[in-house]
Amino acid sequence: MISDSVKFLLNDKIIVIKNPDPNQTLLNYIRTELKKTGTKEGCSEGGCGACTIVLGELVANKIIYKAVNSCISFVPILNGKQLIIVEDLVSKNGQLHPVQHAMVKFHGSQCGFCTPGFVMSLFSMFKNNKKLSNELIIDSISGNLCRCTGSVSYTHLRSPRDLSTSRMPSSA
């Protein structure tokens, strides 16, 4: 049975979309309806990761965060979940999330087009894991491509210490 609405959490606000278009991609919804343009469109095929967003879902009384390619995911997938986009990571007082801070500190991007996707993939990994490892970090960005450097600059973030020693905002 098709629902006549989609209900999800964005920041601390419950959003209800009445009669959602089941063919509208999350990328299109985020950029046109929410008017948030940090999430980028690269390949439109789910291969580059520029459009990566994070969905939070309650599973066995624990929120699990999943990096999702928004260009190949559709609005109905939001139902009952939390949507986190790159614009949501900065705290209310303007402090960067540790992943964003590490990107700045270690010069993790060149032109910046792919940066939001890398940040969201790393954010998902960061939220789901208390212990970070080099393998976990590299695995988390394996679905993201950088056309400028071939992702070489992002591999400078290999050290779990790079992410865990970056400033942690009080609300993250």
What are these regions (language model features)?
Residues 1-158:
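Signature of N-terminal electron-transfer/Fe-S-associated modules in redox systems
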Residues 156, 162-172:
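Single conserved hydrophobic/aromatic residue that forms the stacking wall/gate
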